[in-house]
């Protein structure tokens, strides 16, 4: 006699509760059905993987992880996956040799890496500049009047680099109409995520990406996203990957907090993340492709900013703001001029400049010196603060969204330019796949 459906469903709930109890803290109540257990902090990503493995074994559903894909880490998602029509049967012995999960025909891309999807995530709190000034003991109006900061985005509760990265990634996957199982490589950058496993490994675990999907965490601080793009493009051009996820995520406000650093420095920063799906696809009228990239390091400015741990929970900070501001404007201007030469795209024909934005005043100065409208610089630092490696990413998200809404023939190139402590620098061009315009 078959088991009634309601009893079967009850048994599944009992299995889920049993597996959750193994991973939750002893005094933790049973979570709500829709609660994302990783984002709420009830479980870390490795514990969630443990829950999935336990349920797979107890319910005899060996492909549960694949079914969940990018679903939330919730009881409701587990039940939906378990009760789906494609209920797995016990594994049967394989008589044929399976090919590796990543096996497939060689990738022929002519060096092309196309952006299929993009996403962003910001700290959920919007903190006005006057509140930040008060917290740091700054003179009223200092951040707004001298730096141009109107507000900063700040994480709260369980939010962290990992959560922000996951939210941005889900948005990018959705836009790209892709699944975690499609990814061949994850490239992640963060200047604030410390410890092990690395942020890339945690994100791989959260996405339930396949075990043949590589992970690489890259550095460069505020230049990290461009470093990630360069690596992704190389992997795709070499035929080593078809789809690559590039993610940036930084939470500054917990480390650069009042009492740890001066407000003139710490008050400039916010929290955010960005994500991009790059693919070895043939360019279509709706897509953008990675073009020319340049990198370097102005080592003469290596001592202009130094950040490290100090006693008593404080941060050891050396920050020559005046020298860095002069160097930043000059270097960003040179990067853009060099990109013009290499790409044969005039700055007047650029749709947006997704640059690093240490502060809004510096962006305004750069726009004046370049003689381009300030409107071509997406608004990030003014309302979010300096997002570190995600500043360029959030700016590029905005630029791509605006350009994607235009007819294909009206879309314009996007210039990237960023700086990192050291003084690391880099730039790149994102080309639309619409018919090329003759250079001026």
Q: Which positions does each model-derived feature cover?
A:
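Phosphopantetheine-dependent thiolation modules in NRPS/PKS and related acyl-activating systems
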Residues: 2-103
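Condensing-enzyme catalytic core mediating Claisen C-C bond formation in acyl metabolism
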Residues: 100-158, 260-326, 330, 334, ...
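Short beta-strand segments
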Residues: 116-119, 189, 219, 244-250, ...
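Acidic-glycine-rich active-site phosphate/pyrophosphate-binding loop
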Residues: 136-144, 195-209, 246-255, 307-310, ...
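Glycine/charged-rich beta-loop-alpha catalytic/anionic-binding loops adjacent to active sites
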Residues: 149-150, 182-185, 205-219, 255-261, ...
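Claisen-condensing/thiolase-fold acyl-transfer catalytic domains that form or cleave C-C bonds
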Residues: 162, 166, 192-193, 210-212, ...
